[in-house]
Regions:
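Solvent-exposed soluble domains appended to multi-pass membrane proteins
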Residues: 1-256
Length: 256
């Protein structure tokens, strides 16, 4: 199943996309500039991990960066996660630029799966860091290998090269669970589009600029791709556009 997700943020504020996906709530009814993780979640809240826990799932959240970012270490348990795993819990991870790689995140997910109780259901929510902005600096451990014709924008080259690495990590994840005995669903989606430093070049290549976008074109900056894959039959669909706050419910319905 593939399509585009409507999200409420662009260029940052990943926590708001997390909030919408995990709780099913929408940012549309909160004041502009709100960060629910920091302002509105002060106790246990009904959410996807809490629901899955009632069905017997072990629920794990992992984010290979600082535990206190967006107060995740405080909020995740309130949403129903049994365990939260952050940067310091990764042993000898691979780094791309200054962030733990998506490949190391895949290894961690596989580790969770292989260490769980046999036949016990598991839900892992993984928020990656590899492709975090900005993209203007050069690093000794990463050299962009994608270029854009007639463009010297290094930030764009680095961003696209990082996305390529994410594709490879996703391929590894799917290849592993294709062989798994237990039914498995993988939901892969973006939190937000990159910053204007990347997007401006793409617009220019298409003869466009920020000052001359229609309302419909501006809305496209708040869409990200998603894919739902399973190692059993959940049906196939392309162009299944939706909003991130509906995604979890739609996945549960498909999962059966």
């Amino acid at each position: 199943v593939t399509g585009m997700l409507n999200v409420s943020v662009c260029g940052g504020n990943t926590a708001n996309t997390e909030f919408e996906f995990l709780t099913g709530n929408t940012m549309a009814f909160l004041p502009q500039g709100s960060i629910p993780y920091q302002q509105y979640i002060n106790g246990d809240l009904k959410a996807l991990p809490d629901y899955l826990k009632t069905l017997g799932y072990q629920t794990i959240a992992t984010h290979p960066y600082n535990a206190g970012g967006w107060e995740r270490d405080t909020v995740y348990p309130m949403l129903g996660f049994n365990e939260s795993v952050f940067k310091d819990d990764y042993v000898n991870p691979q780094y791309v630029r200054q962030y733990i790689s998506d490949e190391s995140c895949v290894d961690k997910i596989i580790e969770f799966y292989e260490n769980k109780e046999k036949d016990a259901p598991l839900f892992v929510f993984n928020v990656t860091m590899q492709n975090h902005g900005g993209y203007q600096d050069q690093y000794g451990n990463f050299t962009p290998d994608i270029s854009v014709k007639d463009s010297t924008n290094f930030s764009l080259q680095q961003y696209l090269s990082l996305v390529k690495l994410s594709d490879s990590a996703l391929e590894h994840l799917i290849s592993y669970f294709e062989e798994a005995d237990e039914k498995t669903v993988i939901v892969f989606f973006g939190d937000h589009q990159p910053s204007d430093a990347v997007a401006s070049t793409v617009l220019a290549k298409n003869g466009m600029s920020w000052n001359h976008l229609t309302e419909e074109q501006q809305k496209l900056r708040y869409q990200v791709p998603y894919v739902v894959w399973a190692n059993y039959d959940i049906g196939e669909e392309t162009g299944a556009d939706t909003s991130v706050n509906y995604l979890a419910a739609e996945v549960l319905e498909r999962a059966g």
